[in-house]
A protein has these predicted regions:
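Glycine-rich phosphate/adenosyl-contacting loop at the front of the ribokinase-like
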Residues: 8
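Nucleotide-activated chemistry modules centered on ATP-dependent adenylation/adenylyltransferase
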Residues: 28-240
């Protein structure tokens, strides 16, 4: 199955011996290797802690072409990468192509949060994660998305299981990462590590509530967009 969303830069980077040797080292030294799709450092922190304390060897895969704008994407990715480096956990950097992601959700722009647009978004990200797991020869993958109270677990599960059907040799670890005190621990690690705490889910379609915030409370690189968004909402227009 070919997909325009498969991270080509990531695929070429996997040819490097350094990455393979690092992942192989983790896989052979631990009981259970697992690929963790990560949306950000805060959502990954408690999950990574739990995994490493319970006999798992996580490799983090960062593939989130939904995040808007590019500066926000880089902020989240760089922080996640730095945190993995601090913990000594392998980090795989997927491609960022927001324009292609927009094609995947075309026609769903006005869907509410937790609606069909989110399901399509999960499909893109879970397929790329399954392909990454297959290439790294890691059977099981899971995602930090299943730790968010703002996401529907049934949509995530459906997207992941579809990805498994398209990617032989992989298995989705259907774990509810909200349970077991992990939500509380996430908050503790957020404060302890001084993580950047984002104000919106990721894509531009999840930014509507930001129009109610004072401009000075927003990152400088989204203020103009949020202003345009507020004007578009007042006129019932499509997002810029």
């Amino acid at each position: 199955i070919k997909s325009p969303f498969l991270p080509t830069r990531f695929c070429s980077s996997l040819q490097t011996n350094d990455l393979f040797s690092t992942v192989f080292k983790f896989m052979t030294e631990a009981i259970h290797p697992v690929l963790l799709h990560s949306c950000c450092a805060p959502c990954s922190s408690a999950i990574l802690e739990w995994l490493t304390q319970n006999g798992y060897a996580p490799t983090v895969f960062y593939f989130n072409p939904n995040i808007f704008p590019a500066q926000e994407y880089l902020t989240r990715k760089n922080e996640c990468q730095q945190y993995c480096r601090k913990l000594g956990i392998p980090f795989v950097d997927g491609d960022y192509d927001h324009a292609l992601w927009r094609e995947a959700v075309k026609g769903l722009e006005h869907e509410p949060e937790r609606g069909l647009r989110c399901r399509a978004c999960f499909g893109v990200r879970m397929l790329a994660t399954a392909k990454c797991a297959q290439r790294l020869d890691i059977e099981s993958f899971t995602t930090t998305l299943a730790g968010s109270r703002w996401k529907r677990l049934d949509q995530i599960r459906e997207a992941a299981e579809e990805a498994v059907r398209l990617t032989p040799g992989t298995r989705y670890w259907d774990m509810n990462w909200r349970k077991g005190g992990l939500q509380h621990r996430r908050g503790e690690l957020l404060a302890q590590e001084g993580f950047y705490n984002q104000l919106w889910c990721g894509c531009e379609f999840s930014m509507g509530h930001l129009t109610m915030r004072a401009p000075e409370d927003l990152p400088s690189y989204v203020r103009d967009f949020v202003k345009q968004l507020g004007s578009a909402k007042n006129k019932d227009e499509t997002l810029p």
